[in-house]
Amino acid sequence: MSQKIQGGSVVEMQGDEMTRIIWELIKEKLIFPYVELDLHSYDLGIENRDATNDQVTKDAAEAIKKYNVGVKCATITPDEKRVEEFKLKQMWKSPNGTIRNILGGTVFREAIICKNIPRLVSGWVKPIIIGRHAYGDQYRATDFVVPGPGKVEISYTPSDGSPKTVYLVHNFTESGGVAMGMYNQDKSIEDFAHSSFQMALSKNWPLYLSTKNTILKKYDGRFKDIFQEIYDKQYKSEFEAQNIWYEHRLIDDMVAQAMKSEGGFIWACKNYDGDVQSDSVAQGYGSLGMMTSVLVCPDGKTVEAEAAHGTVTRHYRMYQKGQETLTNPIASIFAWTRGLAHRAKLDNNKELSFFAKALEEVCIETIEAGFMTKDLAACIKGLPNVQRSDYLNTFEFMDKLGENLQLKLAQAKL
């Protein structure tokens, strides 16, 4: 390659522990030798978040809003142990949650598939992308124990002063029990719909929304109606032009259909369903180390990509002791490629688009040629049968990817 590809503006967020080490390796070996970026870097490591009172996370989110593309390394969300370990001022919130609250949008998780890595659901030859509506429902509910006999009612008091409406939830006669009130907002459901339709168009795959509207006629019916209305008004012609479709399905039908399908579709889930199904689907494909996570905003223009796993603390402890580490970097690499591919799409940058695709192909081809980290070798042979010759450590694997990328780009005469 005679000169570097001009890549445009990208916001990158550094993270914590083993993934932070890998993040620097990815830039050094796979990105910077080939791509010149206008890079806006934010250190989201736990110490810097603490030093800035988490302002750095908010600044990073605002930068993504401005430049439309963010790539994020995995970060620590502190619990009591972490507060003590790092002597933090307070238990800072999840950076992912903070960024999502500022940007809006929907998180889509997608498996990275290699032919030689066995899947628990062997029929899934294409990814199933799960979009979780990460707002409201059970996660913002008010629930309580009903101590004894009595009525539980829900009331709505209009802010314009008109009369309030009272709904009887249940009349507890013999004993108490439990009760819950939960909600969602039209605006949030509309944003969820737009993000889902945009994702389907960008992947050129059909979209399914799952609800239980036969039981929750008003609540889930609202999701169904809003999706249908937005689809008919704004997306139907585009979907038909790309020969893809949108359908609403009952959640139980959808789970069964997903299990017997070959994959290759977007599945829009309500909050709880998405929480459950995203982990179920991830396990079905074999490994969280091979799972990308992309936040797509309703405008379809703003995207933030990251790995779907954590900071790999156990491996970092080994790294700190100078021991060999065996961390799988693939999902972190794909955070970069998905971010760069989106930058290329926004700027109509064919060279950058080719590079992002080439790097993803190199990752998959290298694994399919038998070069991989221990977690993937264990998927193939079973952990007790894995020998040292079956896998590469983190740094050996990164070197191999770097070598193969150089070869691929040289062959393409980029």
Curated annotation (Swiss-Prot):
Note on cofactor: Binds 1 Mg(2+) or Mn(2+) ion per subunit.
Keyword DNA-binding: no
Site positions for Critical for catalysis: 139, 212
Sequence positions that bind NADP(+): 75-77, 82, 260, 310-315, 328
Binding-site residues for Mn(2+), renumbered to this chain: 252, 275, 279
Residues annotated to bind substrate: 77, 94-100, 109, 132, 212
Tissue: Expressed preferentially in corneal epithelium. Constitute approximately 13% of the total soluble bovine corneal epithelial proteins.
Cofactor: Mg(2+); Mn(2+)
PANTHER family in the cross-refs: ISOCITRATE DEHYDROGENASE [NADP], MITOCHONDRIAL (PTHR11822:SF21), NADP-SPECIFIC ISOCITRATE DEHYDROGENASE (PTHR11822)
Protein's UniProt name: Isocitrate dehydrogenase [NADP] cytoplasmic
This protein's encoding gene: IDH1
